[in-house]
Amino acid sequence: QSLKEPINTVKVNILGTVLALESCRKHNVKRFIHASTIYVNSADGGFYRSGKKAAEDYVEEYKKIYGVNYTILRFGSLYGPRSDDTNGVKMIVKNAILTGNVNYYGSKKSIRAYIHISDAAKACVDILKNKYKNKNIILTGNKKIKVPIFLKRLSAMLKISKKIEFQNKKYTGHYTVNPFNYKSRKGKKFRLKSSVNFYDGLLQLINEVKKEKL
């Protein structure tokens, strides 16, 4: 969406962040929790990455200039219940259920460390501890999943026999294996004590999508 709406991306990701920071400064908020993305260390991600990267700069500058404490959360590939139709995993699942086709916009070599929303939610509570104050935290799943294997399992779960289609367009804004291919902006990886098995979470999402009014 940000590839098509660069101006709106600036309004939401940059201006929206600055307005929130300014409000925190005026009202002496103890800490600003900022939702960012692992794409800030990537050459991929398009305007979305650019907006998030600029927003992080403002968060850090507000600390330097005004003393507004922060924690930056760099989320990886989220999935799970109550995700909207822009979520990558949900789009794949919903399309498969509606059309009987399993499609992926990206490379066959793609790998993701998917993180279930419940694991991410628990982590968001844990990072309120003082040791995470003024830190950049990376929130991804514990296990790396090869996308072709995930898609094969999805096909089996939905009893789809058609061949999986990879539509590797010239530029989709997404990384293939490693997003960290840009000038490093240091972040500490958050270690999940326990996590939802990806395929258990996938089945949960499939059942939820089937219940929706498609």
Briefly describe each language-model feature range.
Residues A120, C124, L139, F150, ...:
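Non-catalytic, hydrophobic alpha-helical segments
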Residues V196-L214:
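Amphipathic terminal alpha-helices
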Residues V18-S23, Y114, D119-K122, D126:
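Conserved mid-core alpha-helix of short-chain dehydrogenase/reductase
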Residues Q1-G76, E208:
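N-terminal Rossmann-like NAD(P)+-binding domain of SDR-like oxidoreductases, especially those catalyzing
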Residues A54, Y58-Y62, I92, F150, ...:
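Hydrophobic alpha-helix immediately C-terminal to the catalytic Tyr-X-X-X-Lys motif of short-chain
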Residues N87, V147, N168-R185, S194-V196:
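Active-site loop of classical SDR/Rossmann-like NAD(P)-dependent oxidoreductases
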Residues K53, L78-M91, L98-N101, Y105, ...:
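Glycine/proline-rich active-site loop of Rossmann-fold NAD(P)-dependent oxidoreductases
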Residues S107, N134-I137, L151-K152, K159-P179:
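C-terminal "lid/loop" region of Rossmann-like NAD(P)-dependent oxidoreductases
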